[in-house]
From Swiss-Prot:
One of its GO terms (molecular function) is nucleic acid binding. It comes from Rhizobium meliloti (strain 1021). This is UPF0102 protein R00337. Belongs to the UPF0102 family. It comes from the Bacteria. Disulfide bonds: none annotated. Pfam families: UPF0102. InterPro entries: Restrct_endonuc-II-like (IPR011335), tRNA_endonuc-like_dom_sf (IPR011856), UPF0102_YraN-like (IPR003509). NCBIfam families: PRK12497.1-5.
């Protein structure tokens, strides 16, 4: 059996990540959130989903893993710092930033399960 090329593995992982993000966005929308941005990139970092419900802004990191525990532990301290830095930049560009409260969430996407939303995860 021939091994997959690295490019093929990367593409599969990228596709799996995008599907997980869309599943997470659907989960959040059904909870009453409005998706403001997906894959928001800055020079400081990236936020998978920025969702808003009223004056609450949720900066969401999406992880597709085999288990909930694996997904939570996959969000490292470095990733948390990058997400916080990117969210500060996003907030500074909002006209009503003084009214907004920010929360950092994780949505764990596991096989054959509904995505699990973990509010205020870090």
């Amino acid at each position: 059996m021939k091994a997959e090329r690295p490019d093929t593995r990367k593409l599969k992982a990228l596709k799996r990540g995008h599907i997980a993000e869309y599943r997470a966005a659907l989960c959040l929308m059904l909870k009453g959130y409005r998706i403001v941005a997906m894959r928001y990139r800055t020079r400081l970092g990236e936020i998978d989903i920025i969702a808003r419900r009223g004056d609450l802004v949720a900066c969401v990191e999406v992880k597709a893993r085999v288990s909930l525990e694996d997904a939570v532990f996959a969000v490292t301290d470095t990733a948390q710092r990058r997400i916080r830095a990117a969210s500060d930049l996003w907030l500074s560009r909002q006209g009503d930033f003084h009214r907004l409260s920010v929360r950092y969430d994780i949505v764990a996407v596991t096989p054959w399960r509904w995505p699990r939303h973990l509010p205020d995860a870090f």
